[in-house]
């Protein structure tokens, strides 16, 4: 039986690049991602640097099949995120290889967060007006999601600026 370990580590939605970097650092140390849950990561022992890990938000089943054709293995998902791993010996493994694909990825995150933020804002205001005690919780969630949206918008603006420099 392979040696396993589970690690609890919290990443915010705008930290997906840091999460991916950490997962690849773990693979470099000989621990490859085998399963994931909300902030829980299960790793199995591997050869250091044997795998490259990538994550993507809410890809279609066609996209998942395409990634599989590239030689990657679907590890699993958590909420709207899916995780892939591929043997490093197969060469470079980039899912978001250009500015346009990165902007599209950030736009998907933006749409999801916007809908959840709007729902929490509406529920928070409605519950506050009806003197429900949970209204403040929805408003707090809306505020946190607004912060996340600001971070995502900042990332998109930086990419747009980078694209304009290359044109």
What are these regions (language model features)?
Residues 1-167:
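Terminus-proximal functional modules
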């Amino acid at each position: 039986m392979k040696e396993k370990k589970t690690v609890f580590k919290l990443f915010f939605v705008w930290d997906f690049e840091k999460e991916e970097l950490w997962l690849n650092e773990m693979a470099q140390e000989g621990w490859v991602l085998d399963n994931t849950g909300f902030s829980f990561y299960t790793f199995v022992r591997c050869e250091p640097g044997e795998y490259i890990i990538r994550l993507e938000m809410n890809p279609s089943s066609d996209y998942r099949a395409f990634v599989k054709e590239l030689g990657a293995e679907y590890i699993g998902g958590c909420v709207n995120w899916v995780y892939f791993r591929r043997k490093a010996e197969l060469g470079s493994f980039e899912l978001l290889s250009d500015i346009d694909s990165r902007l599209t990825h950030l736009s998907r995150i933006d749409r999801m967060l916007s809908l959840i933020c709007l729902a929490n804002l509406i529920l928070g205001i409605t519950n506050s007006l009806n003197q429900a005690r949970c209204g403040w919780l929805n408003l707090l969630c809306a505020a946190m999601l607004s912060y996340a949206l600001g971070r995502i918008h900042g990332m998109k603006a930086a990419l747009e600026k980078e694209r304009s420099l290359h044109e």
